[in-house]
Amino acid sequence: MLFDGYRIVRELHASNRSHIYLAADIETDELVALKIPSIDLRDDPAYLKRFMMEEWVARRIDSPNVLKPPSLSRRRNYLYVVTEFIEGQTLTQWMIDNPKPHLETVRAIVEQIARGLRAFHRKEMLHQDLRPDNIMIDRTGTAKIIDFGSTLVTGVVEAAPLAVHGDILGTLQYTAPEYFQGESGTPRSDMFSLGVIAYQMLTGRLPYGSQIAKARTRSQFGRLKYRSALEGKQEIPAWIDGALRRAVHPDPYKRYESLSEFTFDLRHANANYSSAPALIERNPLLFWKFATAILACVVVVLLAVLHSVRH
């Protein structure tokens, strides 16, 4: 099948928002990925504006850890996005295939993703939808950030609107809490998403479980309970858990100021995080079970003493 100068090889991905195909340029035989908008959203101007922004964003970012457009471009007769073809797998699939990755492997992947995010931030852009499905790991082990449909470009808000009337562009479990409160995103918002991904790679779960998706108000986010990465993962150093805890803090001002600080703390023991948090912080349920058991023992002893005194 031919399409606007490309030979369609096969479908790579399909969703209710777009279809992605592997295609070959008829002139150069270069393999590329073609992303075509869903016909169901052809009357959605906000979606179409975000879609048109994707390749524009890709052409302005130069990083080995960000999806690239092809070097050549031709006049087009239809609306679609052309990018390099990455032969590999999503980070989601990678985590399924590698359920217990070595700490060093996780560090290397997180550092690559951070480099890609810094390329966005240097251009005053926020990715806003960082999640395992939007990260590809190629056959050489290189991590690449993909899908720029939710990217915010400073000064071009009208072309890529942020969340409107509670319509969060990112995926709930990885979306920073400030977005749910109607606040503007910052680089620390992308930091939150990266922290959640790092936590998930090491533990196989999410730091707040399903709580993020349920919370909406400032007070609800203030009550979020971080589940320590040390639970059931004794091989993870306490200072790694401390770094993760700070990266995914519900309050953006209590997160790291920069991505480089986070990646540094994943490699170097921070004295502030050298000891495990108190049991009540790591496992509140277990703490109260112990506390209840101790209290019950105290009550039994007091009753026994009282009984002996009376007799």
For every predicted segment, state its role.
Residues 13, 53, 62-65, 168:
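Flexible N-lobe loop architecture of eukaryotic-like protein kinase catalytic domains
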Residues 38-60:
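AlphaC helix of the eukaryotic protein kinase fold
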Residues 72:
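Activation-segment/catalytic-loop signature of the eukaryotic protein kinase fold
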Residues 76-90, 94:
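Conserved short submotifs of the Hanks-type protein kinase catalytic core
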Residues 109-110:
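Activation segment signature within eukaryotic-like protein kinase domains
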Residues 115-125:
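Protein kinase catalytic-loop region centered on the HRD/HxD motif
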Residues 171-273:
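C-terminal lobe helix-coil module of Hanks-type protein kinase domains
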